[in-house]
């Protein structure tokens, strides 16, 4: 069940990354002007704080566990998604189909989530797939140093940490969880590459 715990963390992280980062970037790019400037300044401040420091402090203050790790990642790992979403919005906000929706009286949020979002779903999905290995590695690192998921729950990081204590006597036991975690992260990266080639017309033409 150790890979299931790590993969489950990646799935939950994927949903919150799309919800927070994507919405933030789309709104910032669509409204522009002072709204975009203020939102981007906040984004720069949030991105300037080391993410691992925030996650570690939250785990020291709150009770360690899956919910705390998800909450910590939710506060720190949405910046990349928001930048991708904003860049795509800036490309499409002045396109004819958006201008036509405005002319017909469509509201801002209808245009953002019903008109623009379906047209940028490719880059969004690709970014999500690339972000999941980061979440898995962060959880594994925190569990390895004793700040992750507590007993009786178990993840790949906590399993590696436990086997590391007996590395001098049974070094071969630590190899399987390391290989599993590496393959899990590699599979998401390969999936992201495949989705990018399948969903990006520019990649198809190369």
Which residues does each PLM region occupy?
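C-terminal transmembrane helix and the adjacent membrane-cytosol boundary/short C-terminal tail
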Residues: 59-62, 66, 72-76, 122-132, ...
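Short amphipathic alpha-helical coupling elements at transmembrane boundaries
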Residues: 37-44, 58, 87, 99, ...
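Amphipathic cytosolic juxtamembrane alpha-helices at the membrane-cytosol interface
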Residues: 32-40, 90-94, 98-126
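Single conserved hydrophobic/aromatic residue that forms the stacking wall/gate
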Residues: 1-13
């Amino acid at each position: 069940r150790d890979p299931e715990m790590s993969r489950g963390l990646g799935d939950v992280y994927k949903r919150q990354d799309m919800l927070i980062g994507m919405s933030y970037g789309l709104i910032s790019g669509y409204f522009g002007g002072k709204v975009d400037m203020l939102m981007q300044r906040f984004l720069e401040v949030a991105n300037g704080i080391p993410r691992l420091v925030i996650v570690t402090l939250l785990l020291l203050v709150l009770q360690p566990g899956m919910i705390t790790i998800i909450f910590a990642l939710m506060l720190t790992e949405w910046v990349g998604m928001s930048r991708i979403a904003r860049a795509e919005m800036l490309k499409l906000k002045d396109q004819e189909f958006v201008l036509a929706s405005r002319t017909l009286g469509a509201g801002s949020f209808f245009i953002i989530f019903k008109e623009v979002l379906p047209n940028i779903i490719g880059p969004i999905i690709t970014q999500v797939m690339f972000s999941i290995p980061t979440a898995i590695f962060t959880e594994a690192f925190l569990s390895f140093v004793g700040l992750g998921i507590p007993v009786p729950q178990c993840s790949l990081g906590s399993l590696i940490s436990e086997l590391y204590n007996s590395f001098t006597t049974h070094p071969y036991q630590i190899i399987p969880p390391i290989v599993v975690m590496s393959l899990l992260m590699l599979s998401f990266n390969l999936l992201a590459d495949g989705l990018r080639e399948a969903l990006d017309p520019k990649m198809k033409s190369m």
